[in-house]
């Protein structure tokens, strides 16, 4: 069988995913074909994700050429993919410093250490490679990627910008898009937006549109964010993250109807995202739909019983509607699930008080006091409750705190003085 026929047959087996046939063909291929054809097959296996087969081919080639550094590097990469890091490191460390492939080995080592979270060691390896090949763009790109991952955004941006002056893409990465991502990660949103818009001139992709919209939103350019997100929806209706940001953008322009419509559209696409239900609840309130707001907030809490923001929003609605039994039902359900959050104590205290369960009300007013000493509205309710219950010494303490945070309110000073004279 000719080389072309053998490779064609192997490609057909790969496309069919016929492992038994691949194994059968591979044995013959290794025995009959030339080394360069065998190496080409290893590359094909790696491209298709057949790492075990690629390792088998490279191991065979290593047997034939035990001192070939490139084979050691290639096999080390495959072994890392297979989770066999120890053998991969052994191969890489065998490569001599005088070898032309040594800088490449250093980069692979840096990638490994980077994956392990050993960033300082990874940077040392890249710097060593740069000391050998200071003008190699791919090494500068590798360092920029490492700096980006470790949060050194300005240093990374400088390297990416220098590289972008040479060419627009490295290792399949669009440098305009990467620069946008770096500046966005570093909260330089206006600069990020400029790069996203430049990247969109080269290619319109969902991730770039979303990045542009997010950066525009953070730059308070809400109309631009809306424009990008509406285009994103057209391009990819299942880009779930777009709907919340679109709704938030409409809300920032005070178009609450469109914000509500956008978030409901998002819920049709993704009915398991608690953040969508929370925002739907908020927008329902803004549109004067309290029953719908309660429904969406309850959905959010059902998805995550400890979703604090949704719980607080829901209990606030119930309290405003003076549905004190519902407040207590929600609060006690959370307690039964071992969810304790002091922000809910004032609601519980007020609800128990209104239901004339005064001992429970006192318990939660007392528990809430430490966290709400600077909240005048809470302290006012608490002091009146204490006075009603005849707890005058405690009322004096709370009045003293009210005077401290509202020194201009004579009412509290007068009440304190009247208690002093009783």
Indicate residue ranges for each PLM-predicted region.
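TPR alpha-solenoid repeat register
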Residues: 37-38, 71, 105, 139, ...
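Canonical tetratricopeptide repeat
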Residues: 40, 74, 108, 142, ...
